[in-house]
Amino acid sequence: MDEDGLELQQQAPNSFFDATGAGATHMDGNQIVVEVQETVYVSDVVDSDITVHNYVPDDPDSVVIQDVIEDVVIEDVQCTDIMDEADVSETVIIPEQVLDSDVTEEVSLTHCTVPDDVLASDITSASISMPEHVLTSESIHVSDVGHVEHVVHDSVVEAEIVTDPLAADVVSEEVLVADCASEAVIDANGIPVNQQDEEKNNCEDYLMISLDDAGKIEHDGSSGLTMDNETEIDPCKVDGTCPEVIKVYIFKADPGEDDLGGTVDIVESEPENEHGVELLDPNNSIRVPREKMVYMAVNDSQQEEEELNVAEIADEVYMEVIVGEEDAAAAAAAAVHEQQVEDNEMKTFMPIAWAAAYGNNSDGIENRNGTASALLHIDESAGLGRLAKQKPKKRRRPDSRQYQTAIIIGPDGHPLTVYPCMICGKKFKSRGFLKRHMKNHPEHLAKKKYRCTDCDYTTNKKISLHNHLESHKLTSKAEKAIECDECGKHFSHAGALFTHKMVHKEKGANKMHKCKFCEYETAEQGLLNRHLLAVHSKNFPHICVECGKGFRHPSELKKHMRIHTGEKPYECQYCEYRSADSSNLKTHVKTKHSKEMPFKCDICLLTFSDTKEVQQHALVHQESKTHQCLHCDHKSSNSSDLKRHIISVHTKDYPHKCDMCDKGFHRPSELKKHVAAHKGKKMHQCRHCDFKIADPFVLSRHILSVHTKDLPFRCKRCRKGFRQQSELKKHMKTHSGRKVYQCEYCEYSTTDASGFKRHVISIHTKDYPHRCEYCKKGFRRPSEKNQHIMRHHKEVGLP
């Protein structure tokens, strides 16, 4: 290393970081070859030197080379721990720029620029000494380097830096260095750093590199690093005119610095600069549009920051970042005080570097190129501590899908997120204020953003429009249409077919299911299945070995076997009563031992032995009825009650007929109980047919309705005849033109008072007026109560 160069060496754990993942890096002796497509983060150079030779800047105050292509901050890169004799306390952050210069104490560069595709070389100043090569692709910003003393070869070198801006028209990379007020000594062998006293403030360096176009960086050890840009995209127009681009940067100013802003114009130039350095391929060089660099410094005062109440800031904008294709004159006016720039075109610029420079929020921001940007920083406030690698924060999904945000810079230099109104341009500090303000634009809220080009469909959601367009595509393809199995209607996608089938299902809720073997009909498919098993199925796999009777379930066979064995496992705790059925035991206890159970329920008058049982029983009455009938508004507290309701109300046919009285029943068990009631009673035989009945009144009615042809009672209007006077009275009500009994809960109406009463009790009455004398269970009809007694209380009173 000669005395004209300053050697900066970093040793990292054998890695060269390529942010895009599309580049390739390899070592060839002392040569580093880097292939870049869009963006490269230079970090962790392995056993190599980064050198700038013979670079002589003329004006150290402000020389800027701005990237004309890149406006995207890609990703965060944090320097790892430097494995050397000492740790560096200066902070280096590499999101989009490269820090490649050290300045003596007497000279403070505000901006330093190296033009496009030109190796920063020919540095003759003795104060900046770098060994061999430094890649300065696209641009270098050296800002806010104050009170920094660099010792090269163990000696302090103080000299003036003369900047000589090079003219070129390709800027391939951008480097921003934001140093702080700290004092460091860099040795040639390592990088030992001595931190100044406590009077120095904490600071952070931000190092950012980004590329838009693919390129190759080659280092041959002698001629310096070169940048071969292979992209052939020409941003200029065919007539040779190039648009002008405005970029705005904000950096921290030194205490007491008065110059807080300015502009630098960078014009087009030839492929060869004035120092005679030729580009790698002049024929393939990109013509770069004119661009204007607007920079602004902000004083960093901790005292002002403590006194500032950010919540009090409403709509006043000190510096606003404009994202999108707005007029460039508005952008320049927001960045530079009252400076007007005409006929400029603003490119999209995401101000993530500003937010990183003035805040701790390192959340990723997504730009329109689809790449994510985040910022890792190394804090040097810990003195000589190692460069700790911070974990990046998890990316937060934006809270709002419909509201855009903008970042403004407050008087303290911190970024503030505001919510601009897209109609009038007013800015608000919260989304709630913006929503409240949007009520002043009702005509805009009524408009929908997205409209289908094939029909009049409009929506505010992009995904809804996408699904709608897909339906058009599927409709045009008749061979891919989906057909409904029930009605044959075609649909474009499965979602529409599913919705259509739900309509069939709702209609099928009132459909009656008929038995194909008999006239049985019910509204429930489950009841029809049970009917088929009970009546028409001959499969009884569980056979009793004693009597040969078959059962469908093993539990039924187990209960039946107790008849043959005489087993009575259920024993009364108050007497010697035993039963083979648990329900019979409960009935026995409640009826025979009511004195031992003094606690009664106030609602159903059931008795219990202690208060806990009464309280537990009371929950049954308080329980909400959650079992809803699918065919009407009836609700039951349990499934068994609901099933009884469906059988009694919504099952029309009575397939199980009594042979003696021709009475029909829903279930075979009901018919069996009914036949048992005929036993022991005198049967009355019809003399005209085989009809038998125990009730003589029913027999007489049978004879009148079936075997009597005389109809003495005739209607005067329609001449219809009736056998009884009561039948004629009922018939005459039909000619009145009105329905006498109209249900107030539904549309049911009838002229029969008894039929109307049965309807109200069975459908709309939640009370059970007919109660069992043994267990106090309620029923709507007397027939239901009698069936209950025959089933559950047949052994009552037996020892």
Swiss-Prot record:
It comes from the Eukaryota. It comes from Mus musculus (Mouse). Probable transcriptional activator. Keywords: Activator, DNA-binding, Metal-binding, Nucleus, Phosphoprotein, Repeat, Transcription, Transcription regulation, Zinc, Zinc-finger. This is Zinc finger X-chromosomal protein. PANTHER family: CHROMATIN-LINKED ADAPTOR FOR MSL PROTEINS, ISOFORM B, ZINC FINGER PROTEIN. Belongs to the krueppel C2H2-type zinc-finger protein family. ZFX/ZFY subfamily. One of its GO terms (cellular component) is nucleoplasm.
